[in-house]
Amino acid sequence: MPSQEVSVNKVIVHPLVLLSVVDHFNRMGKIGNQKRVVGVLLGCWRSKGVLDVSNSFAVPFDEDDKDKSVWFLDHDYLENMYGMFKKVNARERVVGWYHTGPKLHQNDIAINELVRRYCPNSVLVIIDAKPKDLGLPTEAYISVEEVHDDGSPTSKTFEHVPSEIGAEEAEEVGVEHLLRDIKDTTVGSLSQKITNQLMGLKGLNAQLRDIKQYLQRVGDSKMPINHQIVYQLQDIFNLLPDITNDQFTGTMYVKTNDQMLVVYLASMVRSIIALHNLINNKLANRDAEEGKSDSKEAKEKNKDSKDKDNKETKDKDGKKAEEKADKGKDEGGKGSRK
């Protein structure tokens, strides 16, 4: 069952794994008081160190809330379940394990060492079943050897690995079908952009707080110094602009003025277009009203002409009837004389 050790550069988690973990968490929450659940991740390796996590299954797990060093994971159940999964899909192998965190725990290193019996390059994916903020609910880690500066023996620690959500075509169709009924149609592209920017700022704020806490703990000698982290922080600080430089301030003013000019011109164009539309609507309404009045006058003229024609026709018919009556009387008088 163990496979050759491969470096991990990125972890792709499929929606089926997220649904299975949430279902596992909800089921265990109803029957017990466990704060987190543990399971095994199945998947395969892609090219260039990309791990594709496509399936998972739950494993019986329990731990002491007071003493985190006391825990139990049923590895016999793990082996039996993996054997059955292997019969269904031989391509999927044990690639790591998961728990619902939401943070790293003290006994995660020991649990990871147990899972490494089945997968030497085991990956830990923390899946937050109850996320408080928007964003990805997954955090991936791999175990590495940490070398101490004081010459003490090396120790195991976790190193963060980039993770993302990926899906195949069939999974995308299923997820769209599930989200179709709960999709908010009132949310537009503008609100989505604002929400994404807001979540990005919240994430940046959280990362800055973590950096501050780490530096404070290192400064207070509560945590050992990690030179790799310090070098990365130094690179970040080197990328920050010097706001005290007059040239930088002037450049920012020029850029801000250019952006405000674009906004001003866009507002003027929108106002002019709205004014033209208003004028066009008024002209159209006026033409429509004039057309209605002209049609009414034409109808009245037609009605008067018809009435006049009818009256003239009736007068002519009346005259003809009178002439016939007079002619009949004359012929009757002549006959009586004879």
UniProtKB/Swiss-Prot annotation:
User: What's in the keyword line of the UniProt record?
Assistant: Proteasome
**Signal peptide (UniProt feature, chain positions):** none
One Pfam match, given by its short name, reads JAB
Q: Where is this region: Disordered?
A: 286-338
Output the SMART domains linked to this UniProt entry.
JAB_MPN (SM00232)
What's an example GO BP annotation here? proteasome-mediated ubiquitin-dependent protein catabolic process
Any one of the GO CC terms: proteasome regulatory particle
Organism domain of life: Eukaryota
What the protein does comes down to: Acts as a regulatory subunit of the 26S proteasome which is involved in the ATP-dependent degradation of ubiquitinated proteins.
Family membership: Belongs to the peptidase M67A family.
- State the name under which the record lists this protein: 26S proteasome non-ATPase regulatory subunit 7
Q: Organism, per UniProt? A: Drosophila melanogaster (Fruit fly)
Q: What is the lineage of its organism?
A: Eukaryota, Metazoa, Ecdysozoa, Arthropoda, Hexapoda
